[in-house]
């Protein structure tokens, strides 16, 4: 496939790691955040991949821990006038699209996503223009501008069902931006899919040989894999699914030991779900290999206690999410299509 932008050759500079806080500093910021949430009539929504102390704070303050879409849905239904989104930038944008009347704050607007960065809207528009006969389906991990170009937005939890539905209608698909998830969906459905070639820097680093060695060390363990992982890793899995689906699989599988191939942030909620089971990280480096993300998104790690307190206290252009009104209206169309489709699956 020829594209103007090649995500495979792009090197994304990682943000600096947050300065560690002392125990006293953590206690200070936790109490400050709790007070500011009440004063601002705000609720905190956190992604599964944020650090455990952030997820714990969201729980303690009546917030939400979930995937990106459920974060936005929770925020839209919640009576709070302000949403504090602990995640990456596209999650804040999605929350704003679904709750345009609310103030959306983020600890930092510099928290990126390699899938979002790997799908620049100008190049993606040109790619779509070159294939006008195809239905455009984009993953939730994209900018508002890319969503606005799409016919459908989709999450990993319903990707197979949606593409199977579109395939049954005889539609040919453009899929963006995750090539591994696109490959997985194509194999599951047999649909005619033309994939953009983006990848998640975390899931792309899982190594087959190292995972095989870990499996040999723990032959009684089940392997849980997020479909953003390379095909060879997916083929080793006992369960494949989105973050929420992997947590459900952890409860359902009889195995007492689980090897988990996704961001280690998920361990907080997964361990709550299966307190008696042992969770092991799938390896992201092996012999002769090194890892950059090492199973944790560096941009998710930017959502620290100090940054959250600052967002609630200062607001302003460094923390508030804005989406152009015309762009918002266009992006809402494929998002609502997805929500309606998801409702039919649940119903």
Curated annotation (Swiss-Prot):
Please give the cofactor(s) recorded in the UniProt entry for this protein.
[4Fe-4S] cluster
Biological pathway: Cofactor biosynthesis; NAD(+) biosynthesis; quinolinate from iminoaspartate: step 1/1
Keyword Magnesium included in the entry's annotation = no
Tell me a GO biological process for this protein.
'de novo' NAD biosynthetic process from L-aspartate
Q: What is its EC number?
A: 2.5.1.72
Gene3D superfamilies reported in the protein's UniProt record: NadA-like
| InterPro entries to which the protein is assigned, alphabetical | NadA, NadA_sf, Quinolinate_synth_A_type1
Any binding details for the cofactor? Binds 1 [4Fe-4S] cluster per subunit.
Q: What Pfam families does the database record attribute to this sequence?
A: NadA
Mention any one GO cellular component term assigned to this protein in its UniProt record.
cytosol
Binding of iminosuccinate occurs at 47, 68, 139-141, 156, 226-228, 243
Q: Which reaction does it catalyse?
A: iminosuccinate + dihydroxyacetone phosphate = quinolinate + phosphate + 2 H2O + H(+)
Record's family?
Belongs to the quinolinate synthase family. Type 1 subfamily.
Q: Which NCBIfam families match?
A: nadA, PRK09375.1-1, PRK09375.1-2
Report the function annotation for this chain.
Catalyzes the condensation of iminoaspartate with dihydroxyacetone phosphate to form quinolinate.
What's the name of the protein? Quinolinate synthase
Q: Which organism is it from?
A: Escherichia coli O1:K1 / APEC
Its lineage reads: Bacteria, Pseudomonadati, Pseudomonadota, Gammaproteobacteria, Enterobacterales
Gene that encodes the chain: nadA
């Amino acid at each position: 496939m020829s594209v103007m932008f090649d995500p495979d050759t792009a090197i994304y500079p990682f943000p600096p790691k947050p300065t560690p806080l002392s125990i006293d500093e953590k206690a200070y910021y936790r109490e400050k955040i709790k007070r500011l949430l009440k004063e601002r009539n705000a609720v905190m929504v956190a992604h599964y991949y944020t650090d455990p102390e952030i997820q714990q704070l969201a729980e303690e303050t009546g917030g939400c821990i979930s995937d990106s879409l459920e974060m936005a849905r929770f925020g839209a239904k919640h009576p709070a006038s302000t949403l504090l989104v602990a995640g990456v930038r596209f999650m804040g944008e999605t929350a704003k699209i679904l709750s345009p009347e609310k103030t959306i704050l983020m600890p930092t607007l510099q928290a990126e996503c390699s899938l979002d960065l790997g799908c620049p809207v100008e190049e993606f528009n040109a790619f779509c223009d070159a294939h006008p006969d195809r239905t455009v389906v984009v993953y939730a991990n994209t900018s508002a501008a890319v969503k606005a170009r799409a016919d459908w937005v989709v999450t990993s939890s319903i990707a197979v069902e949606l593409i199977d539905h579109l395939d049954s209608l005889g539609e040919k698909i453009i899929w963006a931006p995750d090539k591994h998830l696109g490959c997985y969906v194509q194999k599951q459905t047999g649909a005619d899919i033309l994939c953009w070639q983006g990848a998640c820097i975390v899931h792309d680093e899982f190594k087959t040989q190292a995972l095989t060695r870990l499996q040999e060390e723990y032959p009684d363990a089940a392997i849980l894999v997020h479909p953003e992982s390379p095909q060879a890793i997916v083929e080793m899995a006992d369960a494949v699914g989105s973050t929420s689906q992997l947590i459900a699989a952890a409860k359902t599988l009889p195995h007492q030991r689980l090897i988990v191939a996704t961001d280690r942030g998920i361990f907080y909620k997964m361990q709550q779900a299966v307190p008696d089971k042992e969770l092991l990280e799938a390896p992201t480096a092996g012999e002769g290999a090194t890892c950059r993300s090492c199973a944790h998104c560096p941009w998710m790690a930017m959502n620290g206690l100090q940054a959250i307190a600052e967002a609630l206290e200062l607001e302003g252009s460094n923390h508030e999410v804005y989406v152009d009104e015309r762009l918002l209206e266009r992006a809402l169309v494929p998002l609502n299509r997805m929500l309606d489709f998801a409702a039919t699956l649940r119903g």
